From Swiss-Prot:
Family: Belongs to the Crinkler effector family.
Ranges for region LQLFLAK domain: 18-54
Name of the protein described by the UniProt record: Crinkler effector protein 1
Assigned keywords, A-Z: Glycoprotein, Secreted, Signal, Virulence
Residue positions the entry lists as glycosylated: N23, N37, N265
Cellular component, GO annotation: extracellular region; host cell
């Protein structure tokens, strides 16, 4: 939603605000302006002419309330918003374009911006000669080009959050978008101090090379049973800053970044596909805190969505001492999280988890309640057949009053055909 301050040309007085979605069109803005001034604007909304309140045809400085307080009549240096179907985000009226945080000085000097000048036709429906530029309807090609440009620019500008920046509110957005239920089972973990924790090198960050070499050696040593089988290996990915980058319509926002280590099934490893064979994604912290959990959840979600078939990864957030926080999808729309205290129990859990789908799967540790199962996101939340087509259709519907009815009906039929074709029971009709 964007707030646009508008002024009627030839009328002295204060600017008035109009709240509107930046993805709405110029035609929608005309409707909103007329509705806001129903008693003073009596013509049809389509007969209004709108100008971008920036000099030099939209390339110069924006007009302020001080500039127009006594009325304005000359629009020759302003850009006409003459295409009714043009999205506001494409004509200089996006939230980013109009963002302005006024100071007290701005308010006192009336240096607050005006965004749109409105020309109301005279009673006989005419508009002065200098304001008579024609407004032509959009062609099918123009509508599709405009929509594609909006979507492309939206994707390019979409916020991509680093995993390390994820917080509890963002985790809640992921959970809500994916319709997840969180399961925190009661674990009666036995005391087992047979494996000591890792001694971090003081005053050196986790990602520094010598620190990485140290914790990789520790993990290699205590996952020796798995690695000696010949079908598992540890992969240090801390230096690959984009391996978990993801943009997916099933998520509320894009995410970017990496983790520290992957445990990979060697038989499926592919040098060209980084996540081939991934069984466990590990994030290491010198000190694990509650605020780190959203990062681990984001890494699990990304890894699960990006991993090839037959990969069912878990996530581990750990300090390699007394915090071993595991996350995985245990059933449809169920996100299970377990925190263990002792390294020995954690390594036993890892072994049972990653071997769970093999013929030599050991029984799950006795302290784990119930049966152990892992699935991936695609098993309960498949990728939309054509998310872009769905979004495009939504935008066409919003522009129903400015596109030809025949064009809109054709797009509806195309979209419906795509939906039917995606249904397995009807797919044979289209092969």
């Amino acid at each position: 939603m964007v707030t646009l301050y508008c002024v009627v040309v030839g009328v002295a007085g204060s600017a008035f605000p109009v709240d509107i979605d930046e993805n709405k069109s110029v035609g929608h803005l005309k409707d909103a302006i007329k509705e806001k001034n129903a008693s003073t604007i009596t013509c049809d909304a389509k007969n209004l002419q709108l100008f971008l309140a920036k000099k030099k045809k939209g390339a110069g400085v924006r007009l302020t309330e001080n500039d127009v307080k006594d009325g304005v009549s000359d629009t020759s240096d302003l850009k006409l918003l003459g295409v009714a179907g043009a999205p506001l985000s494409l004509v200089g009226l996006s939230e980013k374009d109009v963002k302005f945080v006024p100071t007290l000085e701005d308010v006192e000097s009336m240096n607050t911006p005006v965004h749109v000048l409105v020309v109301v036709p005279e009673q006989d429906g005419t508009i002065s000669k200098e304001m008579s530029a024609a407004t032509s309807p959009l062609t099918v090609e123009q509508v599709e080009m405009s929509m594609n440009k909006v979507l492309r620019e939206r994707d390019e500008k979409a916020s991509a959050y680093s995993f390390s920046d994820l917080n509890t509110a963002m985790e809640e957005r992921i959970v809500k978008k994916m319709r997840l239920t969180e399961n925190i089972p009661d674990v009666k973990e036995p005391v087992d101090t047979s494996i000591a924790g890792y001694s971090w090198i003081p005053k050196i960050v986790e990602s520094e090379e010598s620190q990485r070499a140290g914790y990789m050696e520790y993990l290699q040593q205590h996952l020796k049973t798995l690695i000696d089988r010949g079908d598992f290996l540890l992969d240090d990915i801390a230096g690959d800053k984009s391996v978990l980058n993801i943009v997916d319509p099933r998520l509320p926002f894009a995410m970017k970044g990496t983790a520290d280590v992957l445990l990979i099934n060697r038989t499926a490893k592919n040098p060209l596909i980084k996540l081939a064979g991934v069984s466990l994604v590990i994030e290491l912290k010198k000190k694990v805190e509650p605020g780190h959990v959203p990062q681990a959840i984001g890494q699990l979600v990304s890894c699960s969505m990006k991993a090839p078939l037959n990969c069912y990864p878990l996530s581990l957030l750990t300090d390699l001492n007394d915090h071993w926080h595991f996350s995985w999808f245990s059933d449809k729309h169920v996100l299970t999280q377990v925190t263990l205290k002792y390294p020995k129990n954690a390594f036993r859990f890892i072994e049972a988890a990653v071997l769970g789908r093999t013929d030599s799967a050991p029984p799950p540790p006795s302290f784990m309640p119930g049966s152990f199962k892992t699935i991936k996101v695609d098993d309960f939340l498949p990728q939309p057949v054509d998310a872009r087509a769905e979004e495009m259709m939504e935008r066409y519907e919003l522009m129903a009053d400015v596109v030809e009815p025949e064009f809109l009906m054709a797009r509806r039929m195309d979209y419906a055909r795509q939906l039917v074709q995606s249904m397995p029971m009807y797919s044979y009709m289209y092969t």
